[in-house]
Amino acid sequence: MTAERIALISDCEGNVAALQAALRAIKRLAPDSIVVAGDILASPFSPDPPSETIALLRSEPVQAIPGNTDRCLLDWGTPRWPHTLWMRLRRSDPAGSWLDDMAGGQALIAPADLAWLRSLAEEFLVTEGVWVCHGMPGNPWNSIWPRSPIYDANVSAADRDASLRMLANVDATLVLCGHISSPPEYHDQLPDGRDLHVVRADARDAESVGYAVLTRRSDTWHTDWHSARIVARA
């Protein structure tokens, strides 16, 4: 039986060179699916023109979702904005002054590109049992972190339990996500007793961009993390 492979990228945040580097390296591996788990753009302003990031994604065989930074840009000025703002303000860390610049950031995104971003699924099953989200299932603003004081400041027990119940409902036992890069993976348990495996894309810095490649053999997923060197744009 042929092994199934999924490549995972996340949080390039409008850095075209980083996205290019990850996609170039991934395509050499010829996975069955390439997933971009959100934060396609930075909010409110990306380092490169948003049109270049969107054009690159639209030219490649990728399945992408919006992250929390994208949600701000997509929802500003729409009936959805109050809910998006409420989701952000629920976090314990201050929101900062980015609200003042959101209209200007959205204005830099072409209407056709905004429409494409808004057409993306917020979360989805990429293959049987594998759920793609940005942070935690149902909430791109937080992460489905392990139960630890270090990670739990923004996540209540009710939030976590709701995410785990949702995953059980859609029969997902593997979650691919981004938002943060550490820990790169951990294991939990669904309410019905099944094991849950959470995998994140690796970190990005000024010199390299991380990505994960998951391979299913005999109904078990194995993860390898890689990094690709970012080539500065001329």
Language-model regions: role of each:
Residues 92-129:
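Metallo-beta-lactamase
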Residues 4, 82-89, 130-170:
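Active-site-proximal segments of metal-dependent phosphoesterases and phosphodiesterases across multiple
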Residues 8-10, 34-39, 63-68, 132-133, ...:
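Active-site neighborhood of phospho(di)ester-bond hydrolases with catalytic His/Asp-centered motifs
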Residues 5-9, 14-107:
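Core catalytic region of metal-dependent phosphoesterases/phosphodiesterases
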Residues 13-18, 42-47, 69-76, 125, ...:
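Active-site environment of divalent metal-dependent phosphoester hydrolases
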Residues 26-30, 126-127, 169-171, 213:
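Glycine-rich phosphate-binding loop signature in dinucleotide/nucleotide-binding domains
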Residues 1-7, 125-131, 192-197:
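Beta-strand-turn-beta hairpins that frame and shape the catalytic cleft
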Residues 187-234:
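Binuclear metal-dependent phosphoesterase catalytic core
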